[in-house]
Amino acid sequence: IIRSSNVGALCLYLSFKYVFMKVAIVGSRSASDYEAWKKLALGVLPENISMIVSGGAMGIDAFAARLAGELGLPLLEFKPDYGKYGRGAPLVRNTEIVNAADYVLAFPSGESKGTYDAIRKARKQNKRLRVCAL
């Protein structure tokens, strides 16, 4: 039920929620050419980013952190908690990343099992998703 006194707050909430997006950037740990990746990423990133969400690993995750700094955007990192989840920690971390994001931008390579896991989770949650092969 929306009461007339709450309409302004609701409109503000909806405009913030859909105009500003938390974008998850996930991908291969073997990526090594930041400048080439940055050119690709800047060509596909939405303009209305409020935050970058990533996993704190090497490769694309490190690129995402660097790009967030260069763009002056906040970075939210979910690192795997091996003490709590053991070998399944990266998959739990992927769930946390996807849950926190409005939009998922994935950069898989041939061996990107974790990236494909995040892609599957984003699809299952009907998240906005863009997959760019490296």
Predicted regions and their residues:
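Generic low-complexity, intrinsically disordered sequence content enriched
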Residues: 14-18, 71
